[in-house]
Design a protein with these regions (language model features):
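Domain-level signal for Mg2+-assisted phosphodiester chemistry and nucleotide/NA-binding surfaces
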Residues: 1-88
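Extended two-metal-dependent nuclease catalytic cores across DNA- and RNA-processing enzymes
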Residues: 10-12, 39-40, 67-254, 261-265, ...
Length: 270
């Protein structure tokens, strides 16, 4: 939701219009439900909880995002407040399973559910982290940004390369580099394509020294979704088993109260 919200804002705008963002998010849910409901079943809304467990393992995880926000003129308190309001509305009024667990990210929720189910699953996300879940043939992914299916011919190999290279957008350095190199803007040790092609077919113990092996395991725990802590896995399962709070019979009143007039005519698609 944050990504779609930012895309809807002009460069000079410091706040968001909650009515516009609400309409945009709900219309997207309607559209994807119409497109995929018949083959993949009902929507499940997976949201980030606060205080990701990954920061306990790696305190610099996503640290650069806060730095970027602090340097921005946008009113992040107002923006996140609007998003929290909309998330609360989705949980309270809509007939979909809504999962948000303290210390878990949406990635954890999606990873746990994808591993638990054998029926067809469609993940709606542009995040390539989910390619690793495609080791199961029932898991597919659609990118709202490219409007294309996201896939890879070898998800296991993709995951290992991801661990080797790290993920600069999340503040995770490659396995040859120190923890703080991204935050401190220190150039990472280069990794060539030729080296990666050699390493992905080996065990890390075969090509890493002690420090590199430590960094490899650092990245593996942050990136590989099978490392979601067991207590979080249990909480995700419990929330999934709960009956949704919202009912379709209450949607009309919600749409009228929020002046979602353009969506009322499509209410049956929710």
């Amino acid at each position: 939701m944050v990504a779609s919200t930012m895309m809807s804002m002009g460069k000079d705008r410091t706040e968001v219009d909650i009515s516009m963002i609400r309409h945009m998010i709900l219309n997207s849910l309607r559209m994807y439900r119409q497109k995929y409901h018949e083959e993949y079943g009902e929507l499940v809304l997976c949201c980030d909880g606060r205080n990701s467990w990954r920061r306990e393992h790696f305190p610099l995880y996503k640290a650069g995002r806060k730095t970027t926000r602090d340097a921005s003129s946008k009113d992040w308190t107002q923006i996140f407040g609007c998003l929290d309001t909309i998330k609360s509305e989705l949980k309270e009024y809509f007939p979909y399973k809504y999962i948000e667990v303290e210390a878990a990210e949406a990635d954890d929720v999606i990873g746990v559910l994808a591993k638990s189910w054998n029926e067809p699953i469609m993940i709606i996300s542009s995040d390539k982290d989910f390619i690793q879940l495609q080791v199961k043939e029932n898991v597919k992914q659609y990118s709202p940004i490219t409007k294309k299916i996201v896939n890879d011919t070898n998800p296991e190999r993709y995951l290992k390369e991801h661990i080797l290279r790290g993920d600069s957008s999340d503040g995770i350095p490659n396995f040859l580099s120190a923890d703080d190199c991204i935050v401190e803007k220190i150039r990472q040790a280069p990794i060539t394509k030729k080296k990666v092609e050699l390493w992905v077919d080996q065990e890390p113990e075969d090509f890493c020294n002690e420090e590199q092996l430590r960094n490899y395991h650092r990245n593996m725990k942050l990136i590989d979704l099978q490392y979601t802590p067991s207590n979080i896995v249990d909480q995700i399962g419990k929330q999934y088993d709960e009956i949704p709070k919202g009912k379709r019979s209450g949607l009309l009143n919600f749409f009228i109260e929020r002046k979602l007039n353009n969506l009322i005519e499509s209410i049956g698609e929710f």
